[in-house]
Structure formats: C-alpha cells, structure tokens
C-alpha cells in the first residue's frame, strides 16, 4: 500500500484546497416587494412567485 513519505504541511494542504470553497447562492430581487430572494423560489416576504400570489402570509 502507498504511504506518504512525509507529512503534508499546513501550507501545502491549504494551497491544494484554495478552490474548495462554498459559492454564494444566486440572489435576485423580488419584483413584487423588492426583497432579496433565492432564484426560482417563492418570496418569503410576500409569498409571490412569477408575479402571482402563491403562499398566504
């Protein structure tokens, strides 16, 4: 079995993980109330989706 000859340093480990990060979710402004919401989801503030009332407050 392959075993590393030397321990991986913190610097080398962190350099390898530079691209391993969480991306920011796509936020859009609600056309009804102007509150920020996730794309393709019902607005939590006013309950509208695609210009019509979907969820009651």
Curated annotation (Swiss-Prot):
One of its GO terms (molecular function) is structural constituent of ribosome. The keyword Cytoplasm does not apply. SUPFAM superfamilies: Zn-binding ribosomal proteins. Keywords: Ribonucleoprotein, Ribosomal protein. The keyword RNA-binding does not apply. It comes from the Bacteria. Belongs to the bacterial ribosomal protein bL32 family. This is Large ribosomal subunit protein bL32.
């Amino acid at each position: 079995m392959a075993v590393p000859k030397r321990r991986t340093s913190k610097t080398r480990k962190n350099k390898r993980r530079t691209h391993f990060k969480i991306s920011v979710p796509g936020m859009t402004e609600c056309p009804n109330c102007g509150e920020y919401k996730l794309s393709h989801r019902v607005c939590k503030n006013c309950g509208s989706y695609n210009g019509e009332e979907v969820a009651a407050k």
